[in-house]
Amino acid sequence: MSINEEEYLRLEEEIDLGDIDFTDLEEQYEADLGYDNYVIVDGAPIAPEAKVPILIKVLRKLFSTAGEIVEGDEGIFMPMENGKSKGFLFIQYKNVADADTAIKKLNGKKLDAQHRLLVNRLSDIEKYGSVSGEFKEPEIEPFQSHGFLQSWLQDEQGKDQIVLHFNESVGVYWNKKTSEPEPVIEPRRGFTSKYAKFSPKGTYLFSIHPQGIQAWGGADFHRIKRFFHNQVRLVDFSPNEKYMVTLSPLPITLPDSTAERAQFPFGPESEGHKLVIWDMETGEPARTFALPPHLENQKEMQWPLVKWSFDDKYCARQGPDALAIYETPSFQLLEKKLVKIDGIQEFEWAPAGVKLHNSKEANEHLLSYWTPESANQTARVAIMQIPSRQVLRTVNLFQVSDCKMHWQSEGKLLCVKVDRHTKSGKTLFSNLDFFKVTERDIPVEKLELKDVIVNFSWEPKSERFVTISRLDDGNPNPAIPKNSITFYAVEEGKGKNANSKYKAYKQIENKHSNTVFWSPKGRYVAVATISRSSGEIEFYDVSFDDETSKKAAPANVKLLKTDKYSGMTNIAWDPSGRFLAAWSSSWLHTIENGYRIYEFTGNLLRDDSVDQFKEFIWRPRPESLLTSSDRKKVRSNLREYSAQFEEFDAMEADAAVREAILARRKALEDWRAYRAKHAGKKVQTSKVQAEVIEEIKEEIVEEKEEIVE
């Protein structure tokens, strides 16, 4: 029904529009009032009216750095009250993009020592000023179970899982020794744009993408969490998987859209930063950092940039002449200040808690660092206790070219490999300084050598170690085998107060070997030559037991096996120390790509050539939950367990043997079931009387043959 103009005017006079609630329509149809190019600035100085033009001129100059401001009084309006400014002002930019730039660039800007400017979009002030005062129950997402994330540890045969990265696909498999690896999940094409990586305890598998990092886990490796970090390149983890560290070459940039900012994981305080520490439980960033200026222009990035204490309680970053140590989970600076160390070159955390001499604390947090020589000071190596920052031990060094710090896995010993030069500077040689951390006053044993050590490696949970060294004779020809492999162990001193010292128990000269890989369980070590032209692996037993070995000797080295592997690029032990994998990666060359799996004794189990093979990854295992008594029980029943695993191996190797073993097990189960069924029944005796049966056998005692003619 239509109405004329007179009726409309009459209704308009009768109806008060102020009594009508238009809230539902306003929420449904949001009007663009054109305020997005206005910003409101709070925190400005309160100035008398006479000085307001000067203040406006200063602020116009500052805010013009973000974009073009509308000319005249329309561009900047500063409210007045009682002859003074109110401390805030309105600025109109010519476009929305300039207003966004002003918010990003100038929000939090210090105008002077007493005034910090707070810049917000005018439309946001109106939006957040109209928030309802009524409490609204937050919506909690329903709990989503990811299953048992360590289910692979329940495998009856104790098999390990491996990741094979080839072509553009990534697959997870069970290692089955000589047999074809059994897929846990089918290979996924495009699983990662760069590489895949497990967390330190094997709980999560991570894939790298242009948008960020994806965490996978569970029995079927389903998606668990996403971590948005644009163009991320590097990733690292804290030892107990509580935190993840990512690095991107691109700085964090806040989205322009308000809706996108609401979903963005980073706030304004993270803008321009490149390094992010993530909380693995929540999936949220715990702290972000800008790269120090001295790292921004480096072609090769030192990684990791953040190093962790053994229990994730502390982390630290190295900067110019200082060490920044943070407490978790707040990630605030320890005691709110840096640790000043002039010229610090490198630092390392002890990999385990340390029991210092005469200390009640069983798990002290220690870190070591070194500083180079300067005009007024010698080079130094020091051990510091955290959180007290107390320097427990310092050693001065002379004519130092470089230092490398190697902590023993239990944190009881620190070896510092010191590369020194002669006074002429033409010849290099190495010294080894051993800090005995758990003893009184932390004594230091020095081992002086004539060679340059190119590789050093501790045996896990032991005082033995292996070095690869060469004589610096000025002839760098790589075709000449000049490296020496040396096996060291502690020789106990004779007498009551005699000190122990390190002794070389075996040396093998004229080798090309350049890398050392200890089994995670110790005793067995692989010494390898890794190069693009040739490759070789030698397997050694450092506690070989035979009739000629001395029972009390701390080391008896025996070469078990040697295998040539041309084009080998990488080597890795499995977590149990039973197997070693070596592979040729297409990331470095395209010659005979593939992988090999060996037993710890060096026997070759599997040799697979795979086109465009990139990487072989063992899935890590968490530390064993067995107590010392549990381990003792396992050792006492080792023969029984060995028989079970040998049976498993026989079944895997031969289908006929498998069928025979399964049939034998079935027959045994049937027999036991039959016995259990009839065990309680009484035997019915027969009424037939017993009778003795006689049996007569004829036996020929002698036989004669007579011939009649």
UniProtKB/Swiss-Prot annotation:
One of its GO terms (molecular function) is translation initiation factor activity. Residues 1-98 are annotated as: Sufficient for interaction with HCR1 and TIF32. Gene3D superfamilies: 3.30.70.330, YVTN repeat-like/Quinoprotein amine dehydrogenase (2.130.10.10). Its main location: cytoplasm. Signal peptide: none annotated. Residues 1-221 are annotated as: Sufficient for interaction with PIC8. InterPro entries: EIF3B, eIF3B_RRM, Nucleotide-bd_a/b_plait_sf, RBD_domain_sf, RRM_dom, TIF_beta_prop-like, WD40/YVTN_repeat-like_dom_sf. Pfam families: eIF2A (PF08662), RRM_1 (PF00076). It is found in: Cytoplasm. One of its GO terms (biological process) is formation of cytoplasmic translation initiation complex. Residues 37-124 form the RRM domain. Keywords: Cytoplasm, Initiation factor, Protein biosynthesis, RNA-binding. Coiled coil: none annotated. GO terms for cellular component: cytoplasmic stress granule; eukaryotic 43S preinitiation complex; eukaryotic 48S preinitiation complex; eukaryotic translation initiation factor 3 complex, eIF3e; eukaryotic translation initiation factor 3 complex, eIF3m; multi-eIF complex. HAMAP family: eIF3b. RNA-binding component of the eukaryotic translation initiation factor 3 (eIF-3) complex, which is involved in protein synthesis of a specialized repertoire of mRNAs and, together with other initiation factors, stimulates binding of mRNA and methionyl-tRNAi to the 40S ribosome. The eIF-3 complex specifically targets and initiates translation of a subset of mRNAs involved in cell proliferation. Belongs to the eIF-3 subunit B family. Component of the eukaryotic translation initiation factor 3 (eIF-3) complex. This is Eukaryotic translation initiation factor 3 subunit B. It comes from Lodderomyces elongisporus (strain ATCC 11503 / CBS 2605 / JCM 1781 / NBRC 1676 / NRRL YB-4239).
